[in-house]
Amino acid sequence: MHKAVGLDGRRDPHRVLKVLQEIDADIVALQEADKRVGGRGSTVPHELIDSHGMYKPVHLGVRHKRVFDKARKHAARLLKVNTRNIGWHGNAILVKRHVGVLDCAALELPTLEPRGAVIAELLIGDNPLRVVGMHLDLSGLWRRRQMRAILEAIDRRPQKMPTVLMGDTNEWRTEAGCLKELNGEFHLAPTGPSFHARHPVATLDRIIVHKDLNIEAAGVHMSAAARRASDHLPIWARVTA
């Protein structure tokens, strides 16, 4: 969501929520949802999400500890700061009000620059579902390491459940690079190119679904609002057990 800054150069969180309302998904994974400087607060304020009423953030309860590590002599003061972020390294998961949150976790990924992923274990009706939101590196080598780390983290989770990975993989290829790490356990939703929003030619954004789940439909949301809201178009998939 490009920190809520659209192609017109304006930061407009209302526009982000308008696009989410158009898509009307039960579960949303956002990238670049938090600021990179200062307290790293959310670019879509908590109060705005609450007043909008459609979604609730999955609260990870973590702080960006690297901010504090770089200023250890001020750590006591900094730890009192409410960062007001909704994610981890910019990754956030929003769910509709009827979706239950069983557990969640923030992952620190191997990287040369700050990168992370978020895990939410959810309950939709009687059906459990694990969702991973991610934003992988620009480097192909580090993307593969990061995807491997995410899959290993999933394997370590105490509860086994169907899993969907969503986010910006930064992978231009369809059957190579970090996607080879999936080893046939997952399949890619046929969403289509989502980058750049002005003229989408690259399928950088992916919805990756475990083979135990079915993909009923998938695509790219290409409304006028979506084309203005970010440099990436949102993608979607309808998944069933």
Residue ranges of predicted features:
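Surface-exposed patches in mature extracellular/periplasmic domains of secreted proteins
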Residues: 58-61
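Active-site regions of metal-assisted phosphoester/phosphodiester hydrolases
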Residues: 1-27, 35-42, 50-51, 55, ...
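Residues lining the SAM
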Residues: 31
